[in-house]
Amino acid sequence: MYICPVEYEIKPHQKLNLGLKEIWLFREMLFFFAWRDIKVKYKQTVLGFLWAILQPLLLMSIFSLAGSALNIPSESLPHPLFTYSALTLWMIFSTGISNAGNSMISNANIIRKIYFPRLIIPISSVLTALFDFLMAFIILIGMMIFYHDRIKFELDKFLLLFPVSIIITVISTFGIGSLLAALTIKYRDFRYVTPFLVQFLMFVTPVIYPISVFHFTGSKYLLAINPMYSAVELFRSGFNGQILELRLVAISLFFAVMLFIVGIYYFRKTEADFADLA
């Protein structure tokens, strides 16, 4: 009995094409990479997945104490809630781009041996960061319940703004992460540049301070160039009673999309050389 062999034709990718159909065909590999990264991250740790919660909690404690000592305003929110709400979102961004930046080098052996859509690797890094966010988000819900009498929680507003903030975060994380992944495999110096980039971006994002601390004209529009500015502010808007200007959201969303396009373009442009560079 003759069985017709299955053939898979590898074609050059269009540089702005995500290749969603191909990624869907390799979806099991995508979930394998994501779950493997999650298990490896917490392997041989006593507390395991609890570190996804403890890390932002410990940072919250430090920043809240510093904020209280320095009289940094917190937009009428309790300092712990003000800080922790931003940190949970920030962890997606910082963890996502840090892991994605090193992902091609970490998976060098697999890249050299078999073919699969290379974008699966940075996507799995973002999925891993989203898993940590979901773990930390459980504590955030508990904090909102605990501080219910001191916040202005509006369910309909929160349900509207929460997805928008997540979308901005994921788009910008994937864009920068893909760009860094392609740059790092070619220029290993970026392994040392990325941590400084993450730290710098954190201090230009209103994680531990409100935008009101800046008094010069146009400061909010300048900061809105950073997509995480609007992402964090939108996230908080669901329970601090404030409304972010639509123009600021538009600016952040524009730059998030631009980062996404640049990241995908450069990744697609250079991915043919990954196997040789790995």
Language model: regions and residue ranges:
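Hydrophobic transmembrane alpha-helices and immediately adjacent juxtamembrane helices
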Residues: 1-278
